[in-house]
């Protein structure tokens, strides 16, 4: 077990270093492609312009992937700082940020009051950013999108759950949801790197909890997480 943990730590350190070191050449590619487009765009034919657009799109996607890999590495290395966390307020703030990014979408959001737990505030924010962000994204093709965040009891376990009425998923592949780079939808349908839910799982397990999911294709999804202690609901 000690050797395995040591090897895992070395692998995470390696992943962090590689991801960090990739930033410089990626910035160079982005910068030079921007110069090429702005200074020499008039000399490029339509095919060359399309190829340049694809290069810049690939650079953007690679940048997102690096950011997500660095986040995944950081949540494994960061020391836990447990303190009371108001998840209701945190969720409301995150949903307001999502609305500001996409103000035209009429998403119905229902955040249960009084959701509190003891945990690391910054890491739990990352959990909710990913879960609520996913719900927001995967309801993108629904006429009347709905998202709810609440405390619940599931199979004898006290937990929190983010529910939506979006794209859903095939339950046969639910174990893949929380594995890095495993996606149940194409990037063309719903863009993403496949690292967000793996990050959620790692944070939750560091808190002594667990993550799981239920869903049905075309009918939405429910993503659950526990924090190793009963959720505290109600009160001031």
Q: Where do the language-model regions lie?
A:
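Detector for a conserved hydrophobic position within an alpha-helical segment of the HATPase_c
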Residues: 204-205
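Glycine-rich ATP-binding loops of the HATPase_c
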Residues: 208-214
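Conserved catalytic submotifs in the C-terminal HATPase_c
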Residues: 83, 103-116, 152
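Short acidic helix/loop segment immediately C-terminal to the autophosphorylated histidine
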Residues: 37-48
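Short alpha-helical segment of the dimerization/phosphotransfer core of two-component systems
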Residues: 57-62
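A conserved beta-strand-to-alpha-helix junction within the catalytic ATP-binding
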Residues: 81-96, 148-151
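Short alpha-helical Gxxx[C/S/T] motif in the catalytic ATP-binding
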Residues: 196, 200
């Amino acid at each position: 077990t000690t050797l395995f943990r040591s090897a895992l730590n070395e692998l995470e350190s390696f992943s962090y270093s590689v991801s960090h070191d990739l930033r410089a050449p990626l910035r160079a590619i982005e910068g030079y492609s921007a110069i090429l487009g702005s200074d020499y765009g008039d000399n490029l034919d339509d095919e060359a312009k399309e190829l340049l657009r694809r290069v810049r799109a690939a650079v953007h996607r690679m940048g997102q992937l690096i950011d997500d890999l660095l986040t995944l590495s950081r949540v494994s290395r960061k020391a836990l700082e447990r303190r009371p966390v108001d998840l209701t307020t945190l969720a409301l703030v995150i949903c307001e940020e999502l609305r500001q990014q996409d103000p035209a979408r009429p998403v119905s959001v229902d955040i249960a009051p009084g959701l509190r737990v003891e945990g690391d505030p910054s890491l739990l924010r990352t959990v909710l950013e990913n879960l609520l962000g996913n719900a927001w994204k995967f309801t993108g093709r629904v006429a009347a999108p709905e998202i709810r965040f609440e405390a619940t009891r599931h199979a004898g376990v006290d937990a929190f759950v983010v529910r939506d009425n979006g794209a859903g998923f095939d339950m046969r592949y639910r174990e893949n949801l929380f594995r890095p780079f495993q996606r149940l939808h194409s990037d063309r349908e719903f863009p993403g790197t496949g690292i967000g839910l793996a990050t959620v799982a790692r944070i939750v397990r560091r808190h002594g909890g667990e993550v799981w999911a239920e869903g049905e294709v075309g009918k939405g999804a429910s993503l659950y997480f526990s924090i190793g202690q009963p959720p505290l609901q109600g009160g001031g």
